[in-house]
Amino acid sequence: GVTLEIEVNVMPGKGNLVLTGKLGDVMKESAQTGISYIRSISGQYDVKPEFFQENDIHIHIPEGAVPKDGPSAGITMALAMLSAITNHPVRADIAMTGEITLRGRVLPIGGLKEKLLAAKNAGMHTVCVPKENEKDLSEISEEITEGMEILLVEHMDQVIKAAFV
């Protein structure tokens, strides 16, 4: 497991979602699901509905030569898009993993041990983990989780609350 940095730019355009960084199909679909969820809640953040027709959103995951795939970055991409759209900063010491649904539910992921180790090595103090992965935590040594706050999340609302500064 490695941590991925996710960059999002919003610019005037025609409502396109641009995805770069050698992303696989599942990861691209995850980004699409994330933007659909963000659009559905954008009114809560005073984002006008026409915003999404008048702007393009570009998601880039650096190290473009390295292939990336899977649904695990779904909540992270959704949060990054919401942050870029609302100009609301995200804490620098938080990592997260989880598949996102159209309704903002957070679904379980695989490889939790490796992901937590990568987060620890990257200096993260807090990690949002799907509640459905709680059973996997018992198999992970305290050496890895020591000094880290593990937040078990079921919905994007919890992720947003934990991550926004």
Residue ranges: model-predicted function:
Residues 2-165:
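Peripheral, non-AAA+ core regions of ATP-driven protein-machinery
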